[in-house]
Amino acid sequence: MFNTRLAIFLLLIVVSLSQAKESQPFDFFEGTYDDFIDCLRINNITIEEYEKFDDTDNLDNVLKENVELKHKCNIKCQLEREPTKWLNARGEVDLKSMKATSETAVSISKCMEKAPQETCAYVYKLVICAFKSGHSVIKFDSYEQIQEETAGLIAEQQADLFDYDTIDL
């Protein structure tokens, strides 16, 4: 019984990883805490203000781009500090650098046709367009990579089981 439940749980983890999608448009940011705080400071945003902005209850406003310019500039600041560059030297969307699939590239391009000229609003729109297109920053090269990611967890779980219990995936 325990064996079956554990196998189902691990299978759900693998499926979740392979289907991973951000719950908020900005969940993919990998910047350091210092970068995050610096961007907030530069844009005169408190932690409390950011938490309200990033709250799931505010998602509708975020997706409709119905947010203050300082929040858009904060997102621009954070995106500029990301290791994967989404903009070219002219500050325009760079779908190749973003590693967008052909399908998401078409969606992002179409969405960006109505992008504002103001730089913070432009970058904010890009992030929203990427999110709406399903562009994911979480990419696995292969199924083997998922197995490698979960192998340690499986080994730990197996070590905790009795000799006659096994984990089959």
Curated annotation (Swiss-Prot):
Disulfide bonds join C39-C77, C73-C120, C111-C129. It comes from Drosophila melanogaster (Fruit fly). SUPFAM superfamilies: Insect pheromone/odorant-binding proteins. InterPro entries: PBP_GOBP_sf. Present in the aqueous fluid surrounding olfactory sensory dendrites and are thought to aid in the capture and transport of hydrophobic odorants into and through this fluid. Belongs to the PBP/GOBP family. Keywords: Disulfide bond, Olfaction, Sensory transduction, Signal, Transport. One of its GO terms (cellular component) is extracellular region. Residues 1-20 form the signal peptide. One of its GO terms (molecular function) is odorant binding. This is General odorant-binding protein 57a. Transmembrane segments: none annotated. One of its GO terms (biological process) is sensory perception of chemical stimulus.
